[in-house]
């Protein structure tokens, strides 16, 4: 990381993110390695965000917390797509409530937590919005991110027949990680009303985890969504 020319060290530098494309706590043999890696990354002094859909032992959370250098250096996130159909859509994970309990344990250790409503499946997730909001408020989770659904034939098949998708809310969109690939995805403009509903219920909702990280640290988002007038910017007032 430090050898990357684009890496900026320090509190106001590059946000280090782990777990977006693979769960770092999925199996026991990866847990210790992941914890030790996060500790080494914390030592760099940069803001760090990592995520998991699995339950983490309190002793490991406490171990991590001891290395945090400043308030809000670390942001822990979990993901919820559905409360009622998680066994079908997210098999081999722990229940949404168990995931949020882990978020609460991080908060108890002084590490801010965030819930990714991601992917937000139009026709499924929106029908459970009140349940999700209730669960977040029950465990005092005050930050969440609503994420687009990227859909292919393989993904559609894996979701199963029980998952209903409102195809009217989809459009051709480029992947964030590769602008050369276009795939069916949720229209961001259709998600703004859900952002507003979370905020009306006292939950700070965004489209990007980096926005949560920037907000808790009161720094400009290095992704520059605000300055580029990007559709992901909700004009929360943080970036100046």
Region roles according to the model:
Residues 1-2, 235:
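Poly-acidic low-complexity segments
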Residues 2-187:
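Conserved AdoMet/S-adenosylmethionine-binding subsite of the radical SAM
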Residues 154-240:
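C-terminal accessory extensions appended to soluble enzyme cores
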């Amino acid at each position: 990381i430090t050898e990357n020319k684009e890496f900026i060290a320090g509190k106001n530098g590059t946000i280090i993110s782990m777990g977006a494309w693979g769960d770092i706590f999925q199996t026991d043999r990866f847990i210790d390695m992941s914890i030790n890696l996060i500790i080494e990354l914390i030592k760099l002094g940069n803001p760090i965000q990592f995520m998991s859909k699995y339950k983490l032992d309190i002793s490991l959370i406490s171990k991590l917390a001891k290395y945090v250098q400043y308030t809000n250096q670390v942001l822990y996130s979990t993901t919820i797509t559905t409360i009622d159909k998680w066994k079908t859509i997210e098999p081999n994970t722990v229940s949404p409530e168990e995931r949020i309990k882990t978020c609460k344990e991080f908060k108890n250790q002084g590490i801010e937590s965030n819930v990714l409503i991601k992917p937000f499946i139009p026709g499924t997730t929106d029908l459970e919005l009140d349940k999700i909001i209730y669960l977040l408020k029950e465990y005092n989770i005050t930050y969440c991110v609503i994420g687009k659904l990227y859909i292919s034939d393989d993904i559609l098949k894996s979701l199963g027949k029980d998952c209903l998708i409102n195809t009217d809310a989809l459009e051709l969109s480029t992947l964030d990680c590769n602008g050369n690939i276009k795939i069916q995805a949720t229209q961001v403009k259709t998600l703004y009303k859900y952002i507003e509903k979370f905020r009306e219920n006292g939950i700070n909702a965004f489209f990007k985890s980096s926005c949560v990280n920037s907000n808790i640290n009161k720094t400009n988002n290095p992704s520059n969504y605000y300055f580029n007038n990007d559709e992901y910017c909700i004009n929360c007032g943080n970036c100046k």
